[in-house]
Amino acid sequence: MENGLGNRSNKLIRDSKRTQYLDYLPPYQADTVNDVVNEIRAADRESLGILQNVTHEASQPFQPQDHPSEAAALLMFHSSSIYNKRCLMAYHNLRLQRLRQYCWSGGKRMESCLDTSLSTYERDYLTRYSELLAAYKGAWSELDLTGSLVPPKNLFIDVRVLKDVGDIETEYGTINLTKNSQLHVRATDVERLIAQGFLAKL
């Protein structure tokens, strides 16, 4: 066990760093997560065994200065458990951040991979978070809470239609968005469609 302490959790973090800027969410690494959890439990068992042996032999509370080798082993197992737990929390927190970003953007870029990429708990989280967000936005229906906080440099932009959308109503009238057409439109009228992948900004 000593030879591999922290290796699996280190792999989780390295993989997370490599994939954090992808347009899709990579599959949940259930096997690696389970390996890290088992390593934490094994470290706890080793620590408990050391303490039981020392206290049984000495018939008194454990004193690190009296048992330096055992104290060093306990410190090693404790440190590895803390490290593994921090890595697990960082891995899961990063994935939850991506799911929250997905909900707030209202985009569909990740939809194709969500069914196969999420764990059962992540699916539950996504469903409940989406419901909470919908209820929150419903209370402020006159505002677009998912819009960008950075004002556009130009009021009007050129876009190319990637997928047929049909007619959309704007303040200046109806716009027909057919695939492969290019239009000069107001940025605020189409920013949601750009985020959802229907349009591309030129």
Curated annotation (Swiss-Prot):
Among its keywords, does the record have Cytoplasm? yes
Localization recorded for this chain is:
Cytoplasm; Nucleus
- What is a biological process (GO) this protein takes part in? DNA strand elongation involved in mitotic DNA replication
Q: Which GO terms describe its cellular component?
A: cytosol; GINS complex; nuclear replication fork; nucleus
Task: Give me the disulphide-bonded residues.
Answer: none
InterPro entries linked to this entry = GINS_A, GINS_bundle-like_dom_sf, GINS_Psf1, PSF1_C
Main location group: cytoplasm
Q: Which UniProt keywords apply?
A: Cytoplasm, DNA replication, Nucleus
Lipid biosynthesis is among the record's keywords: no
Q: Which family does it belong to?
A: Belongs to the GINS1/PSF1 family.
| Assembly | Component of the GINS complex which is a heterotetramer of sld5, psf1, psf2 and psf3.
Function, as annotated, reads: The GINS complex plays an essential role in the initiation of DNA replication.
Give the protein's recorded name.
DNA replication complex GINS protein psf1
